[in-house]
Every structure is written in structure tokens, then in C-alpha cells.
């Protein structure tokens, strides 16, 4: 395979959940930039319409629909729509959509637990099941989960969130082993603190930001594009022998205690 083809996504199809903001938005644009056709979803219809219009103006090949990934019925509908748009073949699945609740362990409710498991773990597991026939039909499939460095270090207030991401990391390894026979690779990206709408309150709190940055060898928080570039690489032919891995994009946060 030529160098150009090894570093291209030309002609591929991708589903990116939660693609209207933050890391998901950056991944959508990164994949399109390397030649992929992308389908995305958001539970916020207004945000989705705004993004789709912006991408249309830029002549990006992106389509999408409203979907709350915590709903099994809506996930099934999403898979049907993706299959219809891409004629039953999908090369790339990016499980990015997720949720976050920050509380001390004794402050969590049963509803908090159910919500986080549904949106962070069950949704990814089920979407992999739904996408499997399409990924297999494409001949070369790549699944990328957006996990978190919180699954590798203990951070107060993150107990349930971190547990769901730890489960995602193990799911990654199981999928990699079971679906290699179908030429489907699975990897996880574990970001540290990234500048996204979901971390705005953290970034605004200068003391909290300073404390976090002090633990990062690079001395700053990350940008969504720094996660998106790895996501794109993991889906390329260049990464064809990489599977079952959890890769931190955290400026060295997890190696610094």
C-alpha cells in the first residue's frame, strides 16, 4: 500500500456519536479532513441543525440525526439510519457521547448510577452490537471508544464515571479479541482534562485549573483537536496492527500520580 493510502480515510464511512461539540465535533471534522463520509448524532436538535448547516456551508460530507444514546430504542433507530445512508457498510464507529456527574461517593443516587451506566457503558456496548454487521460488511472496521484517564487514576467525585470508563477499557480488549476474525480493530482513547463545553466550569475555576495543570508535565490542559488526531490515526490503514489498546492523551497526567 502506498504512503498516501496508508495515511488516508478516503472512501470510508464513519459514525461519531455526540459530534456537535467538544471532542466529538473535533473528531467529525478530523475524519472529514482525511476523506471520510461521516454520520453524527446529538440529543440536542438545535445544536445538530446548527452544526449540519455549518458543515454543509463548508462542503463537508456530514449527515446526522437526533439521538439520545441512553435510549435503546433510539440507538436501534440510529443504526437503521446509518445503515440506510451508508448502504449497510460502516468502516468506523466512534463511541464518543457520554455523561458526567461529579459527587462524593455517599452523595450519588440510584438515578445517577443508572444514568451514567446507560450513557457511558450500555450505549457503547449496544452500538457495537448494532454496528457489527455493518463493520464486518465493510471489510475493514475500526471502533474507537472515548474513555478517560480517570479510569487509571483516582480523582475525588468521579467514582461512578471512572468505573464506567474502566469498563469501557475492558470492553475494548474483549472486542479486540473477539472481532479480530472479522478484521475489526478496537481501541480506546483516554483523554485527560480537555478544553470542551463539558469542562467549562472547571476551566473557569482558576484554582481548580491551576491544581490540575500542576499535575500535568506539559503544564496545560489539552485541546479537542489533540484527541481527534489520534482518533483519525487509529482508523487509518497505518494503524492496521494496533488493537485492544487504551492510549492516554493527557499531557502525561497519569504518569505523574
UniProtKB/Swiss-Prot annotation:
Q: In which pathway does it act?
A: Alkaloid biosynthesis
Q: Which residues form the active site?
A: 161 (proton acceptor)
Q: Per the UniProt entry, how does temperature affect activity?
A: Optimum temperature is 35 degrees Celsius.
> Could you mention a single GO BP entry for this protein?
alkaloid metabolic process
Q: Which reaction does it catalyse?
A: (10bR,4aS)-noroxomaritidine + NADPH + H(+) = (10bR,4aS)-oxomaritidine + NADP(+); (10bS,4aR)-noroxomaritidine + NADPH + H(+) = (10bS,4aR)-oxomaritidine + NADP(+)
Q: Which UniProt key words apply to this protein? A: Alkaloid metabolism, NADP, Nucleotide-binding, Oxidoreductase
Gene3D superfamilies hit by this protein: NAD(P)-binding Rossmann-like Domain
Any idea of its EC number? 1.1.1.-
Pfam families membership = adh_short_C2
Q: Where does NADP(+) bind?
A: 20-23, 42-43, 68-69, 96-98, 161, 165, 194-199
pH dependence of this protein's activity: Optimum pH is 6.
- Extract the InterPro entries matched here: NAD(P)-bd_dom_sf, Sc_DH/Rdtase_CS, SDR_fam, TR
A single MF term (Gene Ontology): oxidoreductase activity
Q: Which residues bind substrate?
A: 100, 149
Which tissues is this protein detected in according to the database?
A: Mostly expressed in stems, and, to a lower extent, in bulbs, roots and flowers.
Q: Which domain of life is it from?
A: Eukaryota
Which top EC class applies here? oxidoreductase
Q: Which family does it belong to?
A: Belongs to the short-chain dehydrogenases/reductases (SDR) family. SDR65C subfamily.
Described by its record, this protein's role is as follows: In the Amaryllidaceae alkaloids biosynthesic pathway, catalyzes the conversion of noroxomaritidine to oxomaritidine, a precursor of haemanthamine- and crinamine-type alkaloids, promising anticancer agents. Can also, to some extent, catalyze the condensation of 3,4-dihydroxybenzaldehyde (3,4-DHBA) and tyramine to produce norbelladine, and of isovanillin and tyramine to produce 4'-O-methylnorbelladine.
Supply the name of the protein: Noroxomaritidine/norcraugsodine reductase
What is the species of this protein? Answer: Narcissus pseudonarcissus
Which gene name does the record give? NR
Amino acid at each position: 500500500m502506498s504512503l498516501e493510502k496508508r495515511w488516508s480515510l478516503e472512501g470510508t464511512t464513519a459514525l461519531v456519536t455526540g459530534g456537535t461539540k467538544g471532542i466529538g465535533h473535533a473528531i467529525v471534522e478530523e475524519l472529514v479532513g482525511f476523506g471520510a463520509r461521516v454520520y453524527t448524532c446529538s440529543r440536542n436538535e438545535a445544536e445538530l441543525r446548527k452544526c449540519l448547516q455549518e458543515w454543509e456551508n463548508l462542503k463537508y460530507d456530514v449527515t446526522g440525526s437526533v439521538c439520545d444514546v441512553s435510549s435503546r430504542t433510539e440507538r436501534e433507530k440510529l443504526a437503521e439510519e446509518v445503515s440506510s445512508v451508508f448502504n449497510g457498510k460502516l468502516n468506523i464507529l466512534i463511541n464518543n457521547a457520554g455523561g458526567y456527574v461529579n459527587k462524593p461517593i455517599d452523595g450519588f443516587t440510584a438515578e445517577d448510577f443508572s444514568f451514567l451506566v446507560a450513557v457511558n457503558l450500555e450505549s457503547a456496548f449496544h452500538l457495537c452490537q448494532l454496528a457489527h454487521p455493518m463493520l464486518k460488511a465493510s471489510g475493514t472496521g475500526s471502533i474507537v471508544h472515548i474513555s478517560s484517564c480517570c479510569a487509571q487514576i483516582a480523582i475525588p467525585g468521579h467514582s461512578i464515571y471512572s468505573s464506567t470508563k474502566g469498563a469501557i477499557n475492558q470492553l475494548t480488549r474483549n472486542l479486540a479479541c473477539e472481532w479480530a476474525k472479522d478484521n475489526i480493530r478496537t481501541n480506546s482513547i483516554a483523554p485527560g482534562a480537555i478544553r470542551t463545553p463539558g469542562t467549562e466550569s472547571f476551566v473557569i475555576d482558576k484554582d481548580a485549573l491551576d491544581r490540575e495543570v500542576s499535575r500535568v508535565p506539559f503544564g496545560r490542559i489539552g485541546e479537542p483537536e489533540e484527541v481527534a488526531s489520534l482518533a483519525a490515526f487509529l482508523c487509518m490503514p497505518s494503524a492496521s496492527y494496533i488493537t485492544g489498546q487504551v492510549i492516554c492523551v493527557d499531557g502525561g497526567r497519569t504518569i505523574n500520580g
